[in-house]
């Protein structure tokens, strides 16, 4: 009997796949929608969250940020492509826009160029949309569930014409099936990760009530440690989707192909008179010479700078040890009580 040599694959030890976070296909707000609309949300459950690509900006020397993001993405069943961050010292003065503040140092210039590189990649590759991440952020173990709810609310918001109405998503028409994206049609920016935003007084706000994935109001934080949370005017465990106003930080934002092209022209080639996040906020708001654009914000934010306490309830990063051991008893660390804190008033 002839001896059949073993193949290389037969020599390999077949390791079982390590635990990942369980995915919920039906959420609090998607349970009552039509099967057709539910199917239209299914792309959000894929490895790029319903976008064509996910790009993360990472300085090569920050291997700690990259390793944590790689691990967080793996257990969340997300695929991220990394873009190399930029040191401002390496950016030639000749390539900077004519409208630039001379006092800007390497940090602001490097951040601007890194985000422009991401936008340029979207245009060059012809991606219909992409989610751009900074590498020091985190998200909830129920991210895909949160994004499905956000998508329903975003679509309702984008289809609502003017008015200062507050709309409960449970009372809204969610039967529409968007043609271009599960998040709705004709958006420029979906700003899902930031350091704070204002809620508009002159436009619609779509509310996700009884959203148990949100933190309590006293645990909601922003870049302004002395500011009272904007969500204090709503009941606990409410998330608001509205026009992205006076946004701060570009931790996570999705960009359409059309928006990426316009941003290359407006911000990459014309002006650098503010840090990139401020420029993007003004571009969205339609101020300082920019036209108004369709930018959707969410509060409390879905992605945030990493902190054991804050705006993310069951942080993947904070619960990594539990996740890797298959434990679903996730924990959240409450913000410490501090005397005189305006959030406790």
For the regions a language model picked out, list residue spans one by one.
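An acidic/histidine-cluster motif and surrounding catalytic segment
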Residues: 1-133, 137-345
């Amino acid at each position: 009997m002839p001896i059949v040599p073993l193949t290389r694959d037969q020599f390999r030890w077949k390791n079982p796949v390590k635990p990942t976070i369980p995915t919920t296909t039906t959420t609090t707000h998607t349970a009552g929608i039509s099967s057709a609309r539910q199917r239209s949300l299914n792309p959000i459950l894929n490895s790029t969250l319903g976008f064509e690509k996910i790009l993360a900006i990472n300085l090569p020397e920050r291997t700690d940020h990259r390793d944590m993001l790689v691990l967080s993405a793996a257990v969340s069943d997300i695929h991220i492509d990394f873009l190399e961050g930029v040191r401002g010292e390496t950016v030639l003065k000749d390539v900077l826009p004519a409208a630039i503040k001379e006092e800007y140092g390497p940090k602001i210039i490097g951040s601007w160029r890194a985000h422009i590189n991401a936008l340029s990649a979207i245009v060059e590759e012809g991606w219909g949309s992409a989610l751009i991440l900074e590498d020091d952020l985190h998200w909830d173990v129920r991210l895909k569930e949160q994004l499905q709810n956000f998508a329903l609310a975003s679509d309702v918001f984008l289809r609502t014409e003017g008015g200062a109405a507050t709309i409960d998503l449970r009372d809204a028409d969610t039967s529409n099936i968007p043609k271009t994206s599960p998040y709705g049609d004709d958006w420029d920016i979906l700003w899902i990760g930031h350091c704070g935003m204002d809620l508009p007084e002159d436009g619609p706000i779509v509310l996700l009530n009884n959203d148990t994935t949100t933190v309590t109001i006293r645990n909601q934080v922003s870049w302004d440690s002395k500011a009272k949370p904007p969500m204090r005017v709503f009941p606990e465990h409410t998330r608001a989707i509205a026009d992205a106003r006076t946004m701060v930080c570009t931790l996570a934002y999705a960009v359409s192909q059309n928006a990426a092209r316009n941003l290359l022209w407006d911000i990459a080639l014309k002006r650098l008179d503010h840090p990139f996040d401020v420029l993007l906020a003004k571009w969205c708001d339609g101020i300082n010479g920019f036209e108004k654009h369709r930018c959707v914000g969410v509060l409390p934010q879905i992605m945030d700078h990493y902190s054991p306490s804050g705006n993310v309830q069951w942080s993947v990063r904070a619960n990594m040890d539990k996740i890797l051991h298959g434990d679903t008893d996730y924990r959240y660390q409450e913000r410490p009580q501090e005397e005189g804190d305006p959030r406790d008033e």
